[in-house]
Curated annotation (Swiss-Prot):
This is Ribosome maturation factor RimP. One of its GO terms (cellular component) is cytosol. CDD domains: YlxS_C (cd01734). SUPFAM superfamilies: YhbC-like, C-terminal domain, YhbC-like, N-terminal domain. The gene is rimP. It is found in: Cytoplasm. NCBIfam families: PRK14633.1 (NF011226).
Length: 150
């Protein structure tokens, strides 16, 4: 699978450069956009993104993991970061989040609340109305931090 191949190539590069690979997203049809999200304990600057982009581009030119034309984007995950895996979810317990499920849960697919806890591969949200709802992480289409600025 393309995404697995990209992780295998990109993760060692980011680690060697001192960054955490937060996630990779592949979007579009025809001309793909490859989005690489990096993090660092001291934050991520535009210069950091340029360094990673240059190194990844050089390796992609050699390894050629994508046969079609593509656009490469490197950025920080940002404040409203997407949560790519259960380990990231565990680290974000207590944060406000938004979730979109692949199939309806309690007749809805969009949820907003506090990430209350993680149990195995399940994430439990406390919704704004006080209810708790549980999702298998693999059933989430989108899952991201939703900063509260109030």
């Amino acid at each position: 699978m393309l995404l697995d191949d990209l992780y295998e190539i990109v993760e060692p590069i980011t680690a060697d450069l001192g960054y955490i690979l937060w996630g990779i997203e592949v979007v579009g049809a025809g001309k793909l956009t490859i989005r690489i999200f990096i993090d660092h304990e001291n934050g991520v600057s535009v210069d950091d993104c340029q360094v990673v982009s240059k190194e990844v581009s050089a390796i992609f030119d050699v390894e050629d993991p994508i046969s079609d034309k593509y656009v490469l984007e490197v950025s920080s995950p940002g404040m409203n970061r997407q949560i790519f895996n259960i380990i990231q979810a565990q680290a974000l317990v207590g944060f406000n989040v938004k979730a979109v499920t692949l199939t309806p849960v309690e007749s809805q697919t969009k949820f907003k609340g506090v990430l209350e806890r993680v149990e195995g591969n399940n994430v439990i949200l406390k919704l704004d109305d006080g209810r708790e709802v549980s999702f298998d992480f693999d059933e989430l289409k989108k899952f991201r931090v939703s900063p509260d600025f109030s």
